[in-house]
């Protein structure tokens, strides 16, 4: 039996956020003999999942994101749609922008996915994820989220998964009435 490999798809949480988003911080205080850390961050800090409320839609209840995944390069999306896996539930799109993570140039990189949104929606996915700060403009977010497909942004290590099937597991924080959440995402190969 082949040994499974776990690939971490989430960036370390740190104060690297989209301009004008809430900054994040960790402050550790001593409380008697114990130390207690206080976390401050926006819902879209680091690798995160967007919920429908992000674009003003009614939120569904919290749930983990898991299922059969496949990763394709943004440049190969058109060919992918012609022959995608039948059991696909999670589509990850590799842009290679994650190599700029932690650098201001990261927020200057954008993808133009507008022409692919209808095809993404037609796949009836649980989620679509990207290794860049945003999958697209407000219209792209609204179309995808209103189709009950969650969006995962700021992922890493997608080059390891390119053109491969895997099991995907994403664990957001269980917070009531929120527009998104940092997510711990992994792939099992």
How would you label these PLM feature ranges?
Residues 1-189:
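Active-/binding-site microenvironments in catalytic and ligand-binding cores
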């Amino acid at each position: 039996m082949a040994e499974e490999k776990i690939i971490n798809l989430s960036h370390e949480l740190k104060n690297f956020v989209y301009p004008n988003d809430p900054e994040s911080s960790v402050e550790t205080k001593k409380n008697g003999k114990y130390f207690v850390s206080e976390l401050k961050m926006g819902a879209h800090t680091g690798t995160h999942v967007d919920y429908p409320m992000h674009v003003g839609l009614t939120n569904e209840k919290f749930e983990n994101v898991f299922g059969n995944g496949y990763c394709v390069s943004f440049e190969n999306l058109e060919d992918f749609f012609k022959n995608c896996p039948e059991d696909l539930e999670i589509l990850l799109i590799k842009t290679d922008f994650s190599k700029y993570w932690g650098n201001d140039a990261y927020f200057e990189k954008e993808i133009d996915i507008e022409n692919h949104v209808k095809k993404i929606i037609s796949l009836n996915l649980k989620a679509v994820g990207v290794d860049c700060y945003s999958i697209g403009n407000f219209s792209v977010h609204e179309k995808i989220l209103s189709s009950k497909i969650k969006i995962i942004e700021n992922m890493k290590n997608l080059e390891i998964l390119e053109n491969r099937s895997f099991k995907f597991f994403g664990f957001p924080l269980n917070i009531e009435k929120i527009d998104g959440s940092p997510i711990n995402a992994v792939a099992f190969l």
